Amino acid sequence: GHLVIVSEFADLEGKDAKAALHAYLIVIQAGAILAVGLIYRKEIWSMLLGFLGMDPRGKRLGFNLIIAFLPAAAMGPFLDDLIESYLFGLLPIAAALFTGALFMHWAESRKKRIEGEYPAKAGKSLDDLTWTGSIFIGFLQCFAMWPGTSRSMMTIVGGYLVGLDRAKAAEFSFLLGLITLTAAAGYKCVTKWSLMSQHLAM
């Protein structure tokens, strides 16, 4: 969203400008993917062991992340062209930024109120996260397809709403982002490669 705003004010239009923007997004997403992979390498290793039947907690976390990823994986390819056609403008992005700020403020206020009134519900761990909670977070992540809506904000708020504490909501959000950003970057490379290759070479 922020990059689209900059491109609008910089008067970057046309196929070449869009290709350069896609190329730049791939580069910065690669940095985010590497950073999250490094920070959460222990959790990633735990999930790998879990899928080999050697770590039940890692297996549970891995399956929950896959479940949370499914809504975006199912909807993203079908909505990609529509989003680029209708939502990559200043007004839609401004609306998303404003609405996202209000949603985040509401969620934080709600969490503080619940923690104050019901200390026992102060926050669950990832071991307590159910598959229904995971898919709920995944559906909230889909709102981040709207440019200007923060993916991490939507998924952290989703974690709040299913009862996770702040640290675990953020952890789940970043691990989900590792999968989602990797898939999104791969999808863009496949579908936009002919336009982006010259800009990536530069």
Predicted regions span which residues?
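Multi-pass membrane proteins that catalyze or facilitate reactions on polyprenyl-/lipid-phosphate substrates
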Residues: 1-202
